[in-house]
């Protein structure tokens, strides 16, 4: 019975296609609504995202081939919206970004593989704002820029 379930899941997933317009369609050419998954050729999950009217809406999770989380993204009606977090292959958080309506908006952070904060940036609706900071590998502040 388990084999039948897996086969049905693969078959139903194969019927969702991405159109030239970047939207996802069900087999009847209707815009797809629901959970969409992509897989690596080895069978491991590469991406899981929710689609509404054929576009990303809500959380999207991207995975490395080893199964570790690579990115967590947020969308609203197909646009970048909310927090995006990136991890390295070992599961260490290396970046955090914020978007509103597909524009960089809010604080952005970049860490090195040892979890040392290296950069802090600020955007307001796509424009560089505030104080941007840079730290060295020991965590000492080395540069500040004001926008």
Q: What do the PLM-derived regions correspond to, one by one?
A:
Residues 1-9:
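Bacterial N-terminal signal peptides
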């Amino acid at each position: 019975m388990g084999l039948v379930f897996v086969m049905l899941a693969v078959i139903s997933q194969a019927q969702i296609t991405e159109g030239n317009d970047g939207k996802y369609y069900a087999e009847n050419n209707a815009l797809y609504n629901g959970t969409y998954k992509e897989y690596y050729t080895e069978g491991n999950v590469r991406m899981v995202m929710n689609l509404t009217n054929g576009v990303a809406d809500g959380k999207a999770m991207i995975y490395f081939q080893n199964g570790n989380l690579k990115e967590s993204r947020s969308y609203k009606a197909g646009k970048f919206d909310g927090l995006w977090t990136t991890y390295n292959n070992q599961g260490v958080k290396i970046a955090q970004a914020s978007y509103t309506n597909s524009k960089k908006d809010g604080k952005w952070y970049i860490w090195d593989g040892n979890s040392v904060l290296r950069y802090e940036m600020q955007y307001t609706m796509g424009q560089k704002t505030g104080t941007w900071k840079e730290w060295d590998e020991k965590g000492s502040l080395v540069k500040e820029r004001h926008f």
